[in-house]
């Protein structure tokens, strides 16, 4: 199978919901008649300038307007309670003060959906706890098994790393990632350490993961509510056990999905290029939505080379770069409509009692 480093593959190659502009001129057409919504859905957003540029693209805003959705910037210099009214608050900001403000707003405005709860997002900012939900799940069925690579947390003192690695029984090479995953460029950096001496060059706090050969391909699994899309990306190349003794040093990469971008075109074995089974991804996504309390995130998944059904989750990111996801505009606007539909149902049911 031919794959360029820019190729993107969706699970089914098509949108799950095909709607024309005429059909979606009012969001009421996508909501059950028994639970009508108002004509305009107001989505307040608090995003970084980088996220605004990549996410709030003209095509998204145009499609959203056609569906009755308006994006309104939140002024973080003014009290949040004095802005709006909002149906949904969409955010990706960090800091204790912002979390406090948002939590107070959630309690005072239970009818507004905050995507996503700040405390739940915080769970993904630490790579020590990030993958614990997957590890605890121990997901295994007829479609495959999903786990996490063996890993070790080093909070300080690089001189202690070789001994800690030996005590933990980790095998070289090891992937080193910053402990804090705050969305910054630095938090996406990774290093590949081939030998004991190179471990001393690493900079704690960090997480060390055993490197799993995976054919140089990873799968980015985007979750938007209940929707799932998969994009195939190049990754770090496999490491031969036979060649390992000849390798030494630390190799640094800006992020794993860019690590092998220089590979240009590659002819991939179908067993490497094949997407993970959809039923397995649906079950994994469902369990993670419940376990993490999040609806907007993505997973970096690899398949162990030489197997068909052994998968590892190596990273989870909140509110990732959806602009890189095929047809994200349709997926995301349909998701926002479903959120408001759920709000309307709850209000209608509450009014009956």
UniProtKB/Swiss-Prot annotation:
Pfam family, one: Ins134_P3_kin
EC number in record: 2.7.1.134, 2.7.1.159
Gene Ontology biological process: inositol trisphosphate metabolic process; response to wounding
GO CC terms of this entry: cytoplasm; nucleus
UniProt: Mg(2+) 1 binding residues: 300, 315
Entry-linked InterPro entries: ATP-grasp (IPR011761), Inositol_tetrakis-P_1-kinase (IPR008656), InsP(3)kin_ATP-grasp (IPR040464), ITPK1_N (IPR041429)
Keyword presence, Transferase: yes
Entry annotated with the keyword Magnesium: yes
Catalytic activity: 1D-myo-inositol 3,4,5,6-tetrakisphosphate + ATP = 1D-myo-inositol 1,3,4,5,6-pentakisphosphate + ADP + H(+); 1D-myo-inositol 1,3,4-trisphosphate + ATP = 1D-myo-inositol 1,3,4,5-tetrakisphosphate + ADP + H(+); 1D-myo-inositol 1,3,4-trisphosphate + ATP = 1D-myo-inositol 1,3,4,6-tetrakisphosphate + ADP + H(+)
Keywords: ATP-binding, Kinase, Magnesium, Metal-binding, Nucleotide-binding, Transferase
Tissue expression pattern: Highly expressed in leaves and flowers, and at lower levels in roots, stems, cauline leaves and siliques.
Region Disordered, annotated ranges: 1-25
Binding site for 1D-myo-inositol 1,3,4-trisphosphate: 50, 92, 188, 220, 317
Cofactor, how bound (note): Binds 2 magnesium ions per subunit.
Binding residue positions for ATP: 127, 177, 209-220, 235
GO MF assignments: ATP binding; inositol-1,3,4-trisphosphate 5-kinase activity; inositol-1,3,4-trisphosphate 6-kinase activity; inositol-3,4,5,6-tetrakisphosphate 1-kinase activity; magnesium ion binding
Binding of Mg(2+) 2, residues: 315, 317
Cofactor(s) the protein requires to work: Mg(2+)
Residue span, ATP-grasp domain: 138-350
Assigned protein family: Belongs to the ITPK1 family.
Subunit and partners: Monomer.
Function statement: Kinase that can phosphorylate various inositol polyphosphate such as Ins(3,4,5,6)P4 or Ins(1,3,4)P3. Phosphorylates Ins(3,4,5,6)P4 to form InsP5. This reaction is thought to have regulatory importance, since Ins(3,4,5,6)P4 is an inhibitor of plasma membrane Ca(2+)-activated Cl(-) channels, while Ins(1,3,4,5,6)P5 is not. Also phosphorylates Ins(1,3,4)P3 or a racemic mixture of Ins(1,4,6)P3 and Ins(3,4,6)P3 to form InsP4. Ins(1,3,4,6)P4 is an essential molecule in the hexakisphosphate (InsP6) pathway.
Entry-linked PANTHER family: INOSITOL-TETRAKISPHOSPHATE 1-KINASE, INOSITOL-TETRAKISPHOSPHATE 1-KINASE 3
Name by which UniProt lists this protein: Inositol-tetrakisphosphate 1-kinase 3
Gene name of the encoded protein: ITPK3
